[in-house]
């Protein structure tokens, strides 16, 4: 997969703080790789951000894209004819009860008795599903991801017009994708979402 960075991506990276450049280019490189596999005609399309910061393929609103990184973990998603969101999260070593109550709501009592490590892991899985949903919706944190009901241990669910999937059987690092249940108005050939 190792390829030279896309010229458009290098230009954007040049304006970023030095500490963010490598992370940014790694995320864009993985996204470009997934685009080459799923929508090859869009692999070199410039990427811009909408008013809320959501990445979009310039001139192609019908192909949803999403990028997430946490530390060295990177995840991307592409949806033909769909809005998509992806989130990857490294578990925190310590999770206060107040954060569990905030993000898990009525399910917090199921996680509080767990070991510190398991609490961090389970919160990370729940958070990735919540965050993937608001990324797909294009609202980010203003969409109050912590208010989305994701029961601990869940592998899939629905929130509004979005379906989310946690890749618990495929990833050791908490990773979830969300995608719209309805199509973008376009001439896209059916619905298809891919998460990597």
Task: For each feature predicted by the language model, list its residue ranges.
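Core catalytic alpha/beta fold that binds nucleotide/phospho-ligands
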Residues: 1-196
């Amino acid at each position: 997969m190792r390829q030279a960075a896309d010229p458009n991506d290098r230009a954007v990276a040049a304006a970023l703080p030095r500490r963010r450049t490598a992370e940014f280019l790694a995320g864009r490189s993985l996204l470009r790789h997934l685009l080459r596999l799923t929508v090859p005609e869009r692999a070199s399309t410039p990427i811009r951000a909408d008013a809320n910061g959501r990445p979009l393929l310039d001139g192609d609103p019908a192909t949803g894209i999403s990028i997430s990184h946490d530390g060295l973990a990177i995840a991307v998603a592409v949806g033909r004819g769909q809005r998509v969101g992806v989130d990857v999260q490294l578990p925190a070593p310590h999770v206060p009860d107040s954060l569990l109550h905030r993000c898990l709501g009525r399910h917090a009592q199921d996680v509080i008795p767990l070991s510190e490590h398991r609490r961090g892991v389970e919160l990370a899985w729940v958070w990735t599903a919540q965050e993937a949903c608001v990324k797909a919706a294009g609202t980010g944190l203003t969409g109050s991801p912590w208010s989305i009901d994701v029961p601990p241990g869940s592998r899939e669910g629905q929130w509004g017009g979005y379906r989310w999937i946690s890749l618990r059987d495929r990833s050791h690092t908490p990773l979830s994708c969300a995608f719209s249940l309805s199509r973008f108005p376009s001439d896209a050939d059916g619905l298809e979402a891919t998460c990597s």
